[in-house]
Amino acid sequence: MTKVRARIELSVGQHSNIPAEMLSFEGLETEKEHVAIVFNQADKTQKTPLVRMHSECLTGDVFHSSRCDCGEQLEESINKMAISGGIILYLRQEGRGIGLYNKLDAYELQSKGMNTYEANNHLGFGDDLRDFKEAAQMLGALNINTIKLVTNNPKKIKDIQDYGITLDEVVHTHAHVKKGNENYLQSKVDHGHQLDLDK
C-alpha cells in the first residue's frame, strides 16, 4: 500500500519564491523516487485539484534544452498552480521511459534526421514506455480520485483513467515553440498530442 513518507515545505519556481510542499512516498511498485509537489495544500483543500504528471527531463527541466518543451511545461504548471493550487507528480521516467543515456543516443539519431519516435524505435524501444500506475498510487495515498489533468498527451489521459482516476477536466498547456524544438513538437502533434503550433 502506498503512503506518504515525508512532507516538507520548500519554495520553488525560477526565483524560488513560490511556496509549496514536496512529498515522498513508500510502497510504490518500482520503488522509483517519484515525488509530489503540492501547492496551496491542494490535496487537503480541493476536491478536484489540478494535477500534472510530469516525467523527469534532465535536459529540459534543469538545463533548459532547446530540443523539447518539458522545462517550459513544468514552469507553466508551477506558475498556474501557484495561483489556483494543484499537484505536480514528478515522475522519474526520463526519455519517455528509456532513461537518460538512451535518450542521448536518440538525440544523436535525431541530429541525423530522425524524429523523436523514429529514434526511439531505431534503438529498439516503443514510442512511449511510461506507465502511470504509480501516479495513480500517489494520488491514492493523498486520498484523491478525481482530478483536473494538465496534459496534451492522450496516453496520459487514457492510462490514468485505466488506473481508476476520474477526470473532471483536461487542461492543455501552451505550445512552447522555440528554435530547435519545432520538429519535436510536430512529431508530438502527429502522435495525437493536443497542441496548436500556429499560435
From Swiss-Prot:
Its EC number is 3.5.4.25. It holds the Pfam family GTP_cyclohydro2. GO terms for biological process: riboflavin biosynthetic process. Its cofactor is Zn(2+). Zn(2+) binds at residues 57, 68, 70. HAMAP family: RibA. This is GTP cyclohydrolase-2. It comes from Aliivibrio salmonicida (strain LFI1238) (Vibrio salmonicida (strain LFI1238)).
